[in-house]
Amino acid sequence: MNKKISAAFIAAILIIPTTANAALKTEVNVSKPTVVVIDTGLDTSIPMFSGRIAQEVCILDWNTCPNGKNFMEGPGASVIPSKFINKNGFDHGTQMTSILLGNNSDINVVFIRIVGNTATGSRQIITELPIVNALNWAFNNKDKYNVQAVTMSQGNHNLFPGKDYCPKTVSTQNQIKRLISVGIPTFLPAGNGRDYKRIDWPACIDDSVSIGAATDYDEIPIWANVDVLKTDFYALGQWDATIPGNEIKSAVGSSVSVQIAAAKWLEIKKNKPSLSYSDIYDLMSKTSTVIANPTGLTGKLMNVTAALNG
């Protein structure tokens, strides 16, 4: 699937001078559950990431990982050159990681960079392959890092018309299914394009946990994509995110919702450790709050308090 993946979020971003992305040399508590975050790149010098980044990985279509190849694993693998990291959406991965960790203090992150940069700082085209390989990496390393969820706050809206609009990307779907088989959900964003019949790929894949954005008034915003059959849950779609340089900016959209949903899912899992993937999903569905968009289309808002008491 040779389609460009665009960041599925709306955010107010100020271009600011960056600091060097020096990795924080701190020990990680590997007994904690880990979320694999698949995104653009990471400023590992952010203080809130200290002791929370279990591993960095780079998986690209191009030979533009920091080691000059299309795969790299280890310190520095997720790094974007500092002169580019606050441009062209490369700060998105830092934002998403900060939102995830800001909503659950008891998890670690493995960050997989899937977006390459050119010598001039442009984003390189992404095919399906790095996504498939990133999901495969998450599965193969699930025991080593205690992986309990995967998030990817990226998507595109290059869809087909009609009800059967979701691209048939069997390789991606099979990787998501394989993760489900070992109890690991893959959270993906519905998108923000004001489409009331279709959500973004790959969230439209039925085996994913597709997440739409909700306002702090418990409503589906007018700009949110909605598919009442394919959107699994809604979660808050706004948060003060950290961007490279350790500045705070407001982020809005279903990208935000994905990270919050994953953080809350793992909160449920921690408090109810005997529950399986299906058990948690059913509990979240049963205890959710019904919300609607301005046209009356409805969805299920995650209600963590109700789920914990359920």
Model segments located where?
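Sec-dependent signal peptide recognition
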Residues: 2-9
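Bacterial N-terminal signal peptides
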Residues: 9-17
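Active-site core segment of subtilase-fold serine proteases
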Residues: 23-108, 116-118, 130-133, 140-146, ...
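C-terminal subdomain of the subtilisin-like protease fold in secreted/lumenal serine endopeptidases
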Residues: 23, 145-154, 207-210, 222, ...
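Substrate-binding/access-modulating region of protease and related hydrolase catalytic domains
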Residues: 115-205, 217, 246-259, 295-296
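Extracellular S/T/G-rich loop segment that most often corresponds to the catalytic His/Ser-adjacent loop
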Residues: 33, 39, 59, 200-270, ...
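Structural recognition of the beta-strand scaffold that forms the well-ordered cores
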Residues: 34-38, 108-113, 146-153, 185-189, ...
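Sec/Tat signal peptide C-region and signal peptidase I cleavage site
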Residues: 18-22
